[in-house]
From Swiss-Prot:
Family: Belongs to the universal ribosomal protein uL11 family.
Functional note: Forms part of the ribosomal stalk which helps the ribosome interact with GTP-bound translation factors.
NCBIfam families: L11_bact
UniProt keyword list: Methylation, Ribonucleoprotein, Ribosomal protein, RNA-binding, rRNA-binding
Organism of origin: Azoarcus sp. (strain BH72)
GO MF terms, alphabetically ordered: large ribosomal subunit rRNA binding; structural constituent of ribosome
UniProt modification remark: One or more lysine residues are methylated.
Subunit-structure text: Part of the ribosomal stalk of the 50S ribosomal subunit. Interacts with L10 and the large rRNA to form the base of the stalk. L10 forms an elongated spine to which L12 dimers bind in a sequential fashion forming a multimeric L10(L12)X complex.
Name of the protein: Large ribosomal subunit protein uL11
GO cellular component: cytosolic large ribosomal subunit
SUPFAM superfamilies tied to this protein: Ribosomal L11/L12e N-terminal domain, Ribosomal protein L11, C-terminal domain
Length: 143
């Protein structure tokens, strides 16, 4: 028989830096889950990723106080800002451009994000990422 699910917890946790402090501790503690067990498992899974890169994670909490978690790919905006070499997007994206990225960089980001995107093919994923970049005030060259 399947375990009874008592809830889902969605968090963004820096890769390799999960610790019991907020927001992880309170979110897991409310449901009676073992916080250190999650932190150790998450840090082990994110060992190969760039430290500090925010990773969205969905934790499924079960009635017997056990849990499973699914890691998603980093947010597109974080990857775009990193590729463009900027700290934040433009406050007026359609008038003030703050940086630019090439089509090759957009394709690389789309490849990374493909498992989480609803795009049917690579070209649709590239257009989705390019649209996100434009809405941040970043020019996409070659598109």
């Amino acid at each position: 028989m399947a375990k009874k699910i008592i809830g889902y917890i969605k968090l963004q946790v820096p890769a390799g830096k999960a610790n019991p402090s907020p927001p992880i501790g309170p979110a897991l503690g409310q449901r009676g889950l073992n916080i250190m067990e999650f932190c150790k498992a998450f840090n082990a899974k994110t060992q190969g990723l760039e430290p500090g890169l925010p990773i969205p994670v969905v934790i499924t909490a079960f009635a017997d106080k056990s849990f499973t978690f699914i890691m998603k790919t980093p947010p597109a905006t974080i990857l775009i800002k990193k590729a463009a070499g900027i700290q934040k997007g433009s406050p007026k994206p359609h008038t003030d451009k703050v940086g630019s990225i090439s089509r090759a960089q957009v394709e690389e980001i789309a490849k990374t994000k493909m498992p989480d995107l609803t795009a049917a093919d690579m070209e649709a994923a590239v257009r989705t990422i390019a649209g996100s970049a434009r809405s941040m005030g970043i020019t996409v060259e070659g598109l």
